[in-house]
Regions:
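Bacterial Sec-dependent N-terminal signal peptides
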Residues: 1-27
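Intrinsically disordered, low-complexity linkers and terminal tails enriched in Ser/Thr/Pro/Gly
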Residues: 17-170
């Protein structure tokens, strides 16, 4: 009887563990991470003249999308690290640059985290924390950009800059 209760308790624990397990699946979206630069010391300066890491978001649709309340993070287990401010939108087929400089007190779109030069991930989530895009990137060799080719839909590769432009325009 004791053995049976022990097995039942173990089974219950396993079922509850499985049922409560959080999954981090990516849900397709019209808004994607299109390009990022984890090492930027001389290439593109932000509005403060600082050469910071950055992430480019691309809108695959032809309609403007309101990004108010979306989140960016460098860790899918902590998807709500930095919230995109209210009133932020991206036009159809347009680009949005967000500086991943660890200084969210600066005016404009500046996150409270930096991208690692050792390689890591960039994660875009909806306000309900549904992951819409997640990009894992290796350590770069020099000041290269990790870009999606073809633009918005393809796989990622290290290449020369296409800041705020189509990655197909080479």
């Amino acid at each position: 009887m004791i053995k049976k209760r022990g097995l039942m308790a173990l089974l219950l624990i396993l079922i509850l563990t499985y049922a409560c397990k959080k999954t981090y699946e990516t849900v397709p979206s019209d808004v994607v991470i299109n390009e990022l630069m984890p090492v930027n010391s001389t290439t593109i300066a932000d509005n403060y003249g600082e050469y910071d890491d950055w992430i480019e978001i691309f809108n695959l649709s032809t309609s403007t999308i309101d990004l108010s309340g979306y989140y960016l993070s460098d860790n899918h287990k902590k998807p709500s690290k930095w919230q995109i401010p209210n009133g932020t939108s991206i036009v159809g087929k347009g680009y949005l640059i967000i500086w991943a400089d660890g200084d969210s007190t600066q005016f404009g779109l500046h996150t409270n985290f930096k991208l690692s030069s050792e390689g890591e991930e960039a994660v875009l989530t909806k306000p309900d924390l549904t992951i819409t895009d997640k990009v894992s990137f290796p350590a770069p060799t020099g000041e290269l950009y990790y870009s999606r080719v073809p633009n918005g839909t393809g796989s990622f590769k290290w290449q020369s800059p296409t800041f705020n432009k189509s990655n197909n325009a080479r």
